[in-house]
Amino acid sequence: MCRAISLRRLLLLLLQLSQLLAVTQGKTLVLGKEGESAELPCESSQKKITVFTWKFSDQRKILGQHGKGVLIRGGSPSQFDRFDSKKGAWEKGSFPLIINKLKMEDSQTYICELENRKEEVELWVFKVTFSPGTSLLQGQSLTLTLDSNSKVSNPLTECKHKKGKVVSGSKVLSMSNLRVQDSDFWNCTVTLDQKKNWFGMTLSVLGFQSTAITAYKSEGESAEFSFPLNFAEENGWGELMWKAEKDSFFQPWISFSIKNKEVSVQKSTKDLKLQLKETLPLTLKIPQVSLQFAGSGNLTLTLDKGTLHQEVNLVVMKVAQLNNTLTCEVMGPTSPKMRLTLKQENQEARVSEEQKVVQVVAPETGLWQCLLSEGDKVKMDSRIQVLSRGVNQTVFLACVLGGSFGFLGFLGLCILCCVRCRHQQRQAARMSQIKRLLSEKKTCQCPHRMQKSHNLI
């Protein structure tokens, strides 16, 4: 019983395989895209005008030529107005069938009869759908689906951008995380049994003109970030979340809204004193950067069409001389290939390492330069004037002595003012007592009274 069932399944599988092979064996295959035109070939060995007829597989006549070079259609014009032939090619022995405005139901076998023989041509019409469409936001994905006759299996679909990017698949082709640079015309090819058909796709990706922005600044300088869009937008809202290199989490820096192309700040971190331009394109300025601000951020812009994201990076350099050591430090997202170099100007490098901090002990007097570079390209540089150690000590001693003398002078002035003020207070008290005694008329000519008054004065 089991053997009989297995045998039936095997026979059924062989029958299906033979039917599939029969579709293409001895036939010419032509591919066509829905809505476009297809040319089905039919060639004569005599290379001259001869009698020919094109038919459907059910023997219904489509068109033909039975002498005198006149094209005869097999039905009413309304039924066969999409079918035609190239009269100019007849004299060369070519009698193609042209089918315009292809439909999915046109996928079938067509028969060309000429010179007492028949030629079968298999037409496979496919339809291309784009989901969600050919106009998308940056970061979204596009799915290209190829619908075709159920007999068609595993075609190769390949789309190529003019800049060289290639995406390939079979009946389903996916393009994920699209960028603005992916916009423009794509040339696509469908290949089946070594037969090819071409179609074009114009893709429009809406978003920020740059996928990432990195600013390289020395400590104390201002940094400005601009976020231009490749399309006109009037309304939306957004925010910038920032993660400093020393922090382990993101925190909000600024939030804003866009209304009628005007930008308004909703909330901002006070410590940074961020400045946001009131008109598009979005432009953010940090008046004065420092090492503690170095890090990465994510700008989010929410529109009616969807949400856009923009990566923002800030790299900050600081060069300082402390005691007898010259230090150059960089913070922020840098490539592992970047190199930090510390040298005297117009001289060979003293220190050059793939690190974020370099130092020189007992640096020579003169102008020093710190450079952050990647390969031959210098990303940023900063300069500092180094003074000799003796000069530094003299300046320090002068500052200390000057401060000491200044303090002593100030202290003496305070004491003098206090003594003078105390003396004036005592004198005022004595005068007040004399006036009181005089007003009471207790004065007399007695010697002891005169002596008392004199002592009070």
Curated annotation (Swiss-Prot):
Pfam families: C2-set (PF05790), CD4-extracel (PF09191), ig (PF00047), Tcell_CD4_C (PF12104). Residues 129-207, 208-317, 318-374 form the Ig-like C2-type domain. Disulfide bonds join 42-112, 159-188, 328-370. A lipid is attached at residues 418, 421 (S-palmitoyl cysteine). Residues 418-457 are cytoplasmic. Glycans are attached at residues 187, 298, 323, 392. Its main location: membrane. It is found in: Cell membrane. One of its GO terms (cellular component) is endoplasmic reticulum membrane. The chain crosses the membrane at residues 395-417. Gene3D superfamilies: Immunoglobulins, transmembrane domain of human cd4. GO terms for biological process: adaptive immune response; calcium-mediated signaling; cell adhesion; cell surface receptor signaling pathway; cellular response to granulocyte macrophage colony-stimulating factor stimulus; defense response to Gram-negative bacterium; helper T cell enhancement of adaptive immune response; interleukin-15-mediated signaling pathway. It comes from the Eukaryota. It is a single-pass type I membrane protein. PANTHER family: T-CELL SURFACE GLYCOPROTEIN CD4 (PTHR11422:SF0). The Ig-like V-type domain mediates the interaction with MHCII. Forms disulfide-linked homodimers at the cell surface. Interacts with LCK. Interacts with PTK2/FAK1. Binds to P4HB/PDI. Interacts with IL16; this interaction induces a CD4-dependent signaling in lymphocytes. Interacts (via Ig-like V-type domain) with MHCII alpha chain (via alpha-2 domain) and beta chain (via beta-2 domain); this interaction increases the affinity of TCR for peptide-MHCII. CD4 oligomerization via Ig-like C2-type 2 and 3 domains appears to be required for stable binding to MHCII and adhesion between T cells and APCs. This is T-cell surface glycoprotein CD4. The gene is Cd4.
